[in-house]
Amino acid sequence: MARLFGTDGVRGVANRELTAELAMALGAAAARRLGRTGAARRRVAVVGRDPRASGEMLEAAVIAGIASEGVDTLRVGVLPTPAVAYLTSAYDADFGVMISASHNPMPDNGIKIFGPGGHKLDDATEDRIEELVHQGPGSRPTGAGIGRVVDAEDALERYLRHVGKAATTRLDALTVVVDCAHGAASLAAPRAYRAAGANVIPIHAEPDGLNINDNCGSTHMQALSAAVVSYGADLGLAHDGDADRCLAVDAHGRVIDGDAIMVVLALAMQEAGELASDTLVTTVMSNMGLHLAMRSAGIEVRTTGVGDRYVLEELRAGLFSLGGEQSGHIVLPSFGTTGDGIVTGLRLMARMAQTGRSLAGLAEPMQTLPQVLINVEVADKATVADAQPVRDAVAQVEAELGDTGRILLRPSGTEQVVRVMVEAADEDTARQMAVRVAESVSAQR
């Protein structure tokens, strides 16, 4: 049986793979596993969602499951994922649930569960919740023991007060176009940026349940780039459906990805003495240009597997203060337990305001190396990289690249494919080397 939990919770097409029945079972299982026993007060969970149409159905089902196990729910409504993580801690809840499929298309949805303190669950806890889902319900409470539901009327205001601390200086001189992806950022992001003083021009901020991520947001940057140039804005910020990501656009309409944002923030934090151990945590997907920029600044880069959960684990283990992904998940542990796109946007604009420099100028140390990616279909993606001819081809490319590039072989998480990625000083070199290794992989079929 396939594992329910992926790298970011449980996801699927709503009402097909992710049914109301499964959502109720997940809510009940989370309540049984995470609801604290022996507490003097009633147990409580925080539940939020993004605005996609299926969210209301799944929210009702999750809450029903939670209530069936005698746990109360604080319903916070449509809010960003990092808001739910923060409020789980702020309300001293037993756990939190976010109903969202992030940047995925509207028909999809997902369920993310946060443990006490708003932290993402470890594999062992997810496995136990999954076991409880398959076991089905046990003995359930009746009467006064059934969980109750309360709407948390102050949820948005509490979250906005929290993220407002990320703006360490006033942003009155900045004009920013904000692409809210018709998602959970649509209300929160413009309010947060205006509260810090910025002149905010929101786009794609009218969610109707059906238009989330529809040719907008952090996975479709073209409209934002055009709007920044058209309005003569200082920058643009793009969020995804649940606002845990932030990508940027400079005044010329050029995209500033998560790697470049991390470089800007790492250098700022190093200058302020806030970059713990002079270390940045990122994943294997970050461009070699990030590593070169950090090396020039004397900043160590710790590399993890793909997924913000692995970045979070490394941040917690090493007590580091900045990490993230090329996709725009940027984590500042002093502000939260997960990536927060609004915090990222505020910190980026604060750096611009403090220095008086443009975003393009601040991002200049990040020189992205040309990258070539080739997908190779294979019979066994788990073992092909260990074949001696493939290892020899990789070793030869690594020797030729030295410190001027890199090669990465990675099995796809969803397809029977191995991805061959090469970065080099020029695209022709990267392509030649990628083809060479891809041919060695293909020969193993």
From Swiss-Prot:
Name the CDD domains on file.
GlmM (cd05802)
Cite the entry's keywords alphabetically: Isomerase, Magnesium, Metal-binding, Phosphoprotein
Q: Which reaction does it catalyse?
A: alpha-D-glucosamine 1-phosphate = D-glucosamine 6-phosphate
Name the active site residues.
102 (phosphoserine intermediate)
Q: Does the keyword Magnesium apply?
A: yes
Q: What is its EC number?
A: 5.4.2.10
Biological process, per Gene Ontology = carbohydrate metabolic process; peptidoglycan biosynthetic process; UDP-N-acetylglucosamine biosynthetic process
What Pfam families would the database entry show? Answer: PGM_PMM_I, PGM_PMM_II, PGM_PMM_III, PGM_PMM_IV
Q: What cofactor does its activity depend on? A: Mg(2+)
InterPro entries associated with the record? A-D-PHexomutase_a/b/a-I, A-D-PHexomutase_a/b/a-I/II/III, A-D-PHexomutase_a/b/a-II, A-D-PHexomutase_a/b/a-III, A-D-PHexomutase_C, A-D-PHexomutase_C_sf, A-D-PHexomutase_CS, Alpha-D-phosphohexomutase_SF
Give me the residues that bind Mg(2+), please. 102, 240, 242, 244
Q: Name one GO cellular component term.
A: cytosol
Domain of life, source organism = Bacteria
Q: Which HAMAP family match?
A: GlmM_B
Q: Function, please?
A: Catalyzes the conversion of glucosamine-6-phosphate to glucosamine-1-phosphate.
Question: Could you identify this protein by its name?
Answer: Phosphoglucosamine mutase
- State the organism named in the record: Mycolicibacterium vanbaalenii (strain DSM 7251 / JCM 13017 / BCRC 16820 / KCTC 9966 / NRRL B-24157 / PYR-1)
Q: What is the lineage of its organism?
A: Bacteria, Bacillati, Actinomycetota, Actinomycetes, Mycobacteriales
